[in-house]
Amino acid sequence: MASLFVSTPSSSLTLKSCHSLHLRRFDRAEFSNFGKASVNQTTRSRHSLRCSAEDDRVREPVNEAPSPVALAEEQKEDHDNNNAPPSPESSEEEEEKKSKQQEMDWKTDEEFKKFMGNPSIEAAIKLEKTRTDRKLKELNKESNSENPIIGIYNSLARDSLTKEKERLEKAEETFKALDLNKLKSCFGFDTFFATDVRRFGDGGIFIGNLRKPIDEVTPKLEAKLSEAAGRDVVVWFMEERSNEITKQVCMVQPKAEIDLQFESTRLSTPWGYVSAIALCVTTFGTIALMSGFFLKPDATFDDYIANVVPLFGGFLSILGVSEIATRVTAARHGVKLSPSFLVPSNWTGCLGVMNNYESLLPNKKALFDIPVARTASAYLTSLLLAAAAFISDGSFNGGDNALYIRPQFFDNNPLLSFVQFVVGPYADDLGNVLPNAVEGVGVPVDPLAFAGLLGMVVTSLNLLPCGRLEGGRIAQAMFGRSTAAILSFTTSLLLGIGGLSGSVLCLAWGLFATFFRGGEETPAKDEITPVGDDRFAWGIVLGLICFLTLFPNSGGTFSTSFFNGPFFRGDDF
């Protein structure tokens, strides 16, 4: 159903007129099994479904004066044909042959293939009804079988197909295509002036231009369209680029179909909440496991608890603050969110929080504000935790319950630049090792400060402009869908190159971002109004922080001492 929102000229039926906003209805009886779309199979067999000046011209037949004898013979034949009643068996066979031949014609028809690239729910339901009716007819022919087992099987199958047909009939009443002839009268000079229209799914795309601000047009136009359609509809305003010309379009779709799409992908279910709780417990376990990697070799269980509790507290503070900020911002914009799913990792303990949008976004500002609320609050909380820990310890040496960061942890990973900037190198230019560095163990860092440092790195990973990560959502709001798709592909490619170069984190995060958070968000109802200069500036600032935090700096922040491997007191220089 994702294709329901993307307006591509190649996947929809283009309906144009040279003189006015004109629609042609295709509702001949022989094509009723295939929904709205049909093809005129007269002398213009399977012609392009396009309203144009050529279609509007009337092709008059050649008038020839028939002879009286020929006219009398034709009248006699017509009279005989009308008086001869067709047999029921022959009519059923002819209808079945006609239906099969018609389906074969549709399979070979190029215009039908284009239409099925953007099928409507109504057309799909009618196609299923046709197949169900055909199966019922086949079962009725086999109902006289003498085998009792086959008879029972046919009876059960017939009951099942009958229920299926009733269900499809009810669904057909719900999902009917909108009558674009009625809808076109709702557009005008005071809302959105439509100059062209084409069918898209069970709704349509009206091409034209806005005459007033979108905030004024949207409620007024939705009310008029819903009244004309006899049911609720949803309206989007977008920009469509064709032949290097940008046009404003208004897309109209039945609200029932949009609700069905969100219902099919909804995660606010019992299983969704169970999965969220399971991932939360798993993430707490990976945080506890990761904490043990940085203890002293002779650490006791009390030392472990003393180190793990601050790290847990730091992570929970970052996650809690960012989650509250995200929920409050989403509620302010009227957007429903799914349960939040933690991403466990045995490298950083947690790789962030994921959730989906379960309702339509009102505009690009909402698409921008919600991910920015999460990432900005996580950055600020992480920075405050690190600063508070360093201030309380009075130094950068970790205090009494320090975690010891091993040298291998600094090699070729995203923590390198920022952690080195905060705690300093293992040795300065003169070879003097930090006073509290432990030979063979690492540099001591306060657990609460380390939670803040990890929080900044994890937030930066989620700010990468890829798919439906927070950074991908921000890029889509700032630059549009096409540019965001290019950035997403480039980011996935760079992560793949990093993974092939030996970085397990790049490989794992690249696979996760591409396959689990790939794609793009549902378009906002207002895709025309930009986010504004202030939001654009904030997006650039967040992008710079992400870049500076994750930039692969193999030489370290202190270039002269970190070109060589880390070393400790007692090593030969």
From Swiss-Prot:
EC number(s) given by UniProt: 3.4.24.-
Transit peptide: 1-50
Region (Disordered): 38-105
Molecular function via GO: metallopeptidase activity
Chief localization: plastid
Membrane topology: Multi-pass membrane protein
A GO cellular component entry from the record: chloroplast membrane
Coiled-coil stretches noted in the UniProt entry, renumbered to this chain: 122-185
PANTHER family in alphabetical order: ZINC METALLOPEPTIDASE EGY3, CHLOROPLASTIC-RELATED (PTHR31412:SF2), ZINC METALLOPROTEASE EGY1 (PTHR31412)
Record's protein name: Probable zinc metallopeptidase EGY3, chloroplastic
UniProt source species: Arabidopsis thaliana
Name of the gene: EGY3
